[in-house]
């Protein structure tokens, strides 16, 4: 989906990172993932989420290019670019199930 690529291309320079392939899949257990090779994968259902939530997930996965973990340093990287990330995470916890009810 062009939406995901354009948002990743927008946010990557803010984080000082690059990425390789970007795939949008029918993921059921993860919203997104980042491989050590820099490949990004996202659930197509994120296209149904509010734009700030989609952007948070993209920033989250791109941040793994700097920190391949969920350490304090990782969250500092996310926070520097997406200071509202906690509210976006809450939105996903509250509304994520409804996104999974959507059919392609």
Language model: regions and residue ranges:
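Walker B catalytic acidic pair
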Residues: 61
């Amino acid at each position: 989906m062009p939406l995901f690529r354009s948002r990743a291309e927008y946010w990557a320079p803010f984080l000082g990172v690059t990425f390789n392939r970007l795939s949008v899949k029918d993921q059921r257990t993860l919203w997104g993932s980042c491989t050590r090779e820099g490949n990004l994968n996202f659930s197509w259902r994120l296209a149904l989420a509010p734009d700030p939530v989609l952007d948070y997930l993209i920033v989250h996965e791109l941040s793994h290019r700097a920190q391949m973990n969920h350490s304090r340093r990782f969250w500092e990287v996310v926070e520097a670019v997406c200071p509202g990330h906690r509210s976006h995470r809450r939105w996903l916890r509250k509304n994520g199930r409804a996104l999974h009810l959507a059919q392609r």
